[in-house]
A protein has these predicted regions:
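Acidic-aromatic/histidine active-site loop/patch
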Residues: 1-3, 160-162, 221
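Walker A/P-loop phosphate-binding motif and the immediately C-terminal alpha-helix
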Residues: 2-40
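P-loop/Walker-type NTP enzyme "switch/lid" segment
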Residues: 28, 32-105, 189
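Glycine-rich phosphate-binding loop used to anchor ATP phosphates in small-molecule kinases
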Residues: 104-121
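Inter-motif core of Ras-like GTPase G domains
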Residues: 121-139
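Beta-strand-loop-alpha "switch" segments that mediate conformational coupling across diverse proteins
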Residues: 160-198, 207, 213, 217
Length: 221
């Protein structure tokens, strides 16, 4: 089992879209994947249609036992655990690690979507991740967030760039750049990723290629 955090202290850089797309692509590649929303705002939870979940990651981090019956599944073939606003409270730093060790079934890959700020839930994610991936575009805003993230942890942080320009300071960066499109929001329909709604499009293929590179880094190819 490998754990990755999709993290950036900057907002608006495509972090949640990336976490969702990686989970879909990993499932397409035959990897049993669990996606966990660790953002108190619950952007991913709402995107996937879990507006009023019965149980959330906060419940499991504060003592609720997770069973296979309580584990939400999606039409895109990955398992999902939603978030709620209680993630803003102080949680024991070892609570996520303990929870992941007691999962009711084995997973090849666990993807953690994190808050776009320096929250306790981000610290939890960094404490358990085998590798951290952060989306970076050509803006100074996202580059600063990358450097800030690298200063926070000893875990390897790899940039995933988008656009034509790869900033030197991003290194190490994934060998595949994401294609971003102004039409992307229109292609994400309902609770489905662009990998489902525009399966053979260039944008979807770029996310698929990035995910395969991630699996190679993790030794899961």
């Amino acid at each position: 089992m490998k754990i990755i955090a999709i993290a950036s202290p900057a907002g608006g850089v495509g972090k949640t879209t990336l976490a969702h797309a990686i989970s879909v692509a990993a499932a397409e590649f035959g990897k049993k994947t669990l996606l966990i929303d660790l953002d108190p705002a619950g952007s991913l939870t709402f995107r996937l249609g879990f507006e009023n979940p019965r149980f959330t990651i906060t419940d499991y981090l504060t003592g609720k036992s997770l069973s296979s019956e309580n584990l939400d599944s999606t039409s895109e073939r990955f398992a999902f655990i939603p978030a709620d606003s209680r993630l803003t409270t102080e949680l024991a730093i070892d609570s996520l690690s303990a929870f992941l060790k007691e999962l009711p079934e084995p997973f090849d890959l666990i993807v953690l979507d994190t808050a776009p700020s320096l929250t306790q839930s981000l610290k939890l994610a960094l404490s358990v991740a085998d590798h951290i991936f952060t989306p970076v575009d050509t803006s100074l805003h996202s580059l600063r967030a990358l450097l800030q993230l690298r200063a926070m942890t000893d875990v390897a942080v790899t940039a995933i760039t988008s656009g034509e320009v790869i900033i030197k300071e991003c290194s190490p960066a994934l060998d595949v750049a994401l294609i971003r499109s102004s039409e992307m929001d229109g292609l994400i329909k309902g609770n489905l990723s662009i990998l489902t709604t525009d399966k053979s499009g260039d944008v979807a293929e770029s996310y698929r290629s990035a995910t395969y590179s991630i699996l190679e880094i993790l030794g899961l190819e």
